Amino acid sequence: MIFVLDVGNTNTVLGVYDGDELKHHWRIETSRGKTEDEYAMTIKALLNHVGLQFSDIDGIIISSVVPPIMFALERMCLKYFHIKPIIVGPGIKTGLNIKYDNPREVGADRIVNAVAGIHLYGSPLIIVDFGTATTYCYINEHKQYMGGAIAPGIMISTEALFARAAKLPRIEIARPDDIIGKNTVSAMQAGILYGYVGQVEGIVSRMKAKSSVPPKVIATGGLASLIASESSVIDIVDPFLTLTGLKILYEKNVDKKQ
């Protein structure tokens, strides 16, 4: 079985693959202060809950956009799993032709999403990932990673309203009854939800205009389903795109690392 870890700024998503099947998956808070022992105890409890042990895991791959956490995670893998993990980063075999000015600047999460997107859906392709930041990745018809856009995530914007506007409350992100809010909470929900729908449709439409072949638009991340339900430009919601990409990259690199 293969253990995959997608470390984001807010949450870490974990998955266990048995062959090509994602058997189990979990979401935990990303904590920069945890030691390798604390992470091991959390993961041990999750594995035990589904009848698994550290010894059931044959390989590990990690994608992270939080560099300070990597030391603890790598030590955890060595100490408890007795496995040296594959880390998504410079030197890893991806198969991507990255056309960024500096390819090393492309975040691990965006690389993993692009690998999975091309494998599952072909090209051209636009991938929208709703995380702490909302990222847009454009892959052309030649399967070249051309770049994209990065915007503040929905939660960041919501928290900024609460923190900077004295009379505005902290709210749940949800679909309001109407675009015209009748109270403060529904007005904020309308502004946040439909504001982001407008952002997605505006950026995606401009990216589509760069391609002579209509690209598929794939959405992933925690709020992808909510945004997609209100948008006409998203073709597919794939909540496990990043985990799939990690599994693919593991297979591309495992022989090289062993």
From Swiss-Prot:
Binding site residues for ATP: D6, V7, G8, N9, T10, N11, T12, V13, T132
Cited Pfam families: Pan_kinase
Keyword Transit peptide belongs to the record: no
Subcellular location per the Swiss-Prot or TrEMBL entry: Cytoplasm
Pathway: Cofactor biosynthesis; coenzyme A biosynthesis; CoA from (R)-pantothenate: step 1/5
The entry's keywords: ATP-binding, Coenzyme A biosynthesis, Cytoplasm, Kinase, Metal-binding, Nucleotide-binding, Potassium, Transferase
Cofactor note: A monovalent cation. Ammonium or potassium.
GO biological process, any: coenzyme A biosynthetic process
Binding site for K(+): D129
Domain of life: Bacteria
ATP-binding in keyword set: yes
UniProt: substrate binding residues: Y100, G107, A108, D109, R110, T184
A single GO cellular-component term on record: cytoplasm
CDD domains documented for this protein: ASKHA_NBD_PanK-III
Family membership: Belongs to the type III pantothenate kinase family.
Task performed by this protein: Catalyzes the phosphorylation of pantothenate (Pan), the first step in CoA biosynthesis.
Designated name of the protein: Type III pantothenate kinase
Organism whose genome encodes this protein: Geobacillus sp. (strain WCH70)
